[in-house]
Design a protein with these regions (language model features):
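Active-site flanking loop/helix segments enriched in acidic
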Residues: 8-30
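Phosphate/oxyanion-binding active-site loops and adjacent basic polyanion-contact surfaces
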Residues: 23-38, 141-149
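Conserved N-terminal diphosphate/IPP-binding helix and adjacent helical/loop segment
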Residues: 1-8
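Surface-exposed polar/charged interaction patches
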Residues: 9, 182, 186, 229-232
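Divalent metal-dependent catalytic cores for phosphoryl transfer on phosphate-bearing substrates
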Residues: 15, 44-219
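Amphipathic, well-packed alpha-helical segments that form the structural scaffold of globular domains
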Residues: 4, 32-39, 43, 154
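Non-catalytic terminal regions of proteins
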Residues: 206-244
Length: 244
């Protein structure tokens, strides 16, 4: 249900105007890719070591769900910040039921993400094709798109899944709450690291089609991670994620 709801909002939208995943459907493709890559990376972080043995399996699943969902939703705010989506043509039907697909509306038919999903908008207004009027790069709306993660997490993730997550280990809940407050921010939590690294690698792969991330790209991630650990006085403790 979370994936279907997410697709209803992002579907044919690009991931950016001129950068990575700029094609139609790029936002959904990039988001799903980041969710998957972050899920794979989550195995390198042991955040359930303090759990009771009977709860560890459930807590591990909760951790995996949190990482995947945060990766999936990390760019969802772009539906608000990317630009103005409007109908270019709509479908009209005559009295005989025949359809005309090239009618240009006389009044603007604009999508409002705060009102309904893109899928609902297309269905409700019989939109045949739409375009995006991108906001200027310096405009404030292009910033802080990550701050929408909290809203869409609670809107798109089914209640049973949210209940399962919030009933899990307090450490997992804390990591999720921190991410909601500042997605992809400066926090050096396991969740932020997993999603940020997945985001960076997915973008690089998009900019180099048909190629795997080069050793240089991956080494940049590794160097950044080592610098982060160098600032942590506990980097060489047995429970450090660098040691694990």
């Amino acid at each position: 249900d979370a994936l279907i709801g997410f697709a209803a909002y992002t579907s044919a939208l690009p991931g950016s105007r001129h950068n990575h995943h700029w094609q139609a459907g790029g936002l959904f493709a990039h988001s799903l890719d980041v969710g998957h890559k972050a899920l794979v990376a989550s195995a390198s972080f042991n955040v359930t070591h303090g759990s009771h043995s009977m709860d560890r399996e459930a807590n591990t699943l909760a951790w995996q769900l949190v990482v995947f969902l945060c990766g999936l939703l990390h760019d969802v705010g772009k539906v608000h910040s990317m630009g103005r989506v409007f109908a270019r043509t709509v479908v009209l039907r005559d009295e005989a039921g025949r359809e005309r697909h090239d009618y240009r509306p006389t009044q603007p038919v604009v999508w409002r993400p705060s009102v309904c999903s893109l899928h609902e908008w297309v269905s409700r207004f019989d939109v045949d094709s739409f375009a995006i009027e991108f906001y200027p790069p310096g405009k404030h709306k292009t910033q802080h798109h990550a701050l929408w993660v909290d809203r869409y997490f609670h809107q798109l993730v089914p209640q049973p899944l949210r209940a399962f997550i919030y009933d899990s280990d307090p450490q997992i809940v804390r990591l999720l709450d921190e991410f909601m407050q500042e997605p992809l921010g400066a926090a050096q939590s396991a969740l932020n690291k997993a999603v940020k690294d997945a985001d960076a690698i997915s973008a690089l792969e998009s900019l180099s089609p048909g190629e795997s991330p080069s050793k240089v790209h991956l080494s940049n991630v590794a160097v950044r991670r080592i610098k982060e650990f160098a600032e942590d006085q506990l980097w060489n403790f047995p429970n450090s994620t660098l040691i694990r």
